[in-house]
């Protein structure tokens, strides 16, 4: 099942008990965050606040608050099915020629999907049913959440920022938080390595002093939103990838003030520009780390047009100490990364980004070890292969007999298969998230790799321990007589 817009997905979630409407007048200032946080931690439904206090526009939160809902957004029943998305991405990153007739036949579905990429331009789009310009532009009329007591101002969190570099044929979609600065101004917090910031830097170099056109889409269809947070190959647009996932082309329309294309069924569109000379102090804000971050200067986005659907819905979220919605997205996208990593490193058995690690700061990888030093090769490869992992501070490598998603297993491997000096890799002066205040320098810090695999000859001179395992025949016998023993419940082993 595919969803043409956010509303059809909302209806689907509600029909399946995955969305709750709240008619009580809840304040976007702090109250929505407290409610959303309690519900998310209880693995509860998405929430639609129909009557936000002092506003007339409903607010949707916790849309992707469970891995199940992320899978549902892509028409899947189980988060494990998201590995199909990873297989598609692995194919697109490095398509291999067919090895023969049978292989060519097997690859036909992927080739057919790849031909269905270009977005489809439509006229009279829903996102432009209502048009506001000039003095009508007033961002304070939107029910923008003020998430935490120490936040400096309300914050736009789920906007898809659409940019285009002067030397690029494709647009970029990225999600960057935006601080409300005034009736028609937001602060665009994009870090220097992100797609939007790179496009802006190229534009400034080629057209110094000129205004840079930018568009922000709020409440796009769920597949396009997820396309913007997926590791799409640099040569492919997020619109094209969303079309692949959806099975039909993404509908777009031209913005009113520039040539950028926007998702046609979006709830709200903000159009405007960035003056390269206008910067403002952004923050502090509570972030996905569970702390308030430092302030810094970022470009100011001046909004010249607001267009939206009739009876528009404002899509929002909050970030805080895990679990939060970004952490749940990370758990779901974990399944996407597995096939991509396996294509480059077939010896990888499984890969896990624990949500407690703030979505990406720690990774655990299980491998089929084949030679001394193998674990170190894999950890180096993981750090360098995908841009998404350059901020991963800790990587733990375990053998295939260890469940890398079970902390009891992982800690057992670390404490029994590691010598701290021999099996720890430290790398200094590497890229680190600017939000990581634990690093000695903003944006630059160290990484640690932990080799918790069994050690081979060459890695140790000692006789290595053999794990204790019960005789399978004894286990089968005890299983067969368990009920006769009078012990209440058989523990899961």
From Swiss-Prot:
Keyword Manganese attributed: yes
Residues binding Mn(2+), per UniProt:
172, 238
Pathway assignment reads: Cofactor biosynthesis; ubiquinone biosynthesis
Q: Tell me the active site.
A: 287 (proton donor)
Quote the cellular component terms of the Gene Ontology held in the record: cytosol; plasma membrane
Reaction(s) catalysed (UniProt annotation):
a 4-hydroxy-3-(all-trans-polyprenyl)benzoate + H(+) = a 2-(all-trans-polyprenyl)phenol + CO2
Principal localisation: membrane
Q: How is the cofactor bound?
A: Binds 1 prenylated FMN per subunit.
Q: Which SUPFAM superfamilies is this protein grouped with?
A: FMN-binding split barrel, UbiD C-terminal domain-like
InterPro entries registered for this protein in UniProt? UbiD, UbiD-like_C, UbiD-like_N, UbiD_bacteria, UbiD_Rift_dom
Which is a Pfam family this sequence falls into? UbiD_N
Which GO MF terms are attached to this record?
3-octaprenyl-4-hydroxybenzoate carboxy-lyase activity; metal ion binding
Q: What is its EC number?
A: 4.1.1.98
Name what cofactor the protein needs: prenylated FMN; Mn(2+)
GO process annotations (BP): ubiquinone biosynthetic process
How it assembles, according to the record, is: Homohexamer.
NCBIfam families this protein is in?
Answer: PRK10922.1 (NF008175), UbiD family decarboxylase (TIGR00148)
Q: Which family does it belong to?
A: Belongs to the UbiD family.
> Mind telling me what this protein is named?
3-octaprenyl-4-hydroxybenzoate carboxy-lyase
Query: Which species does the entry assign this protein to?
Result: Shewanella baltica (strain OS195)
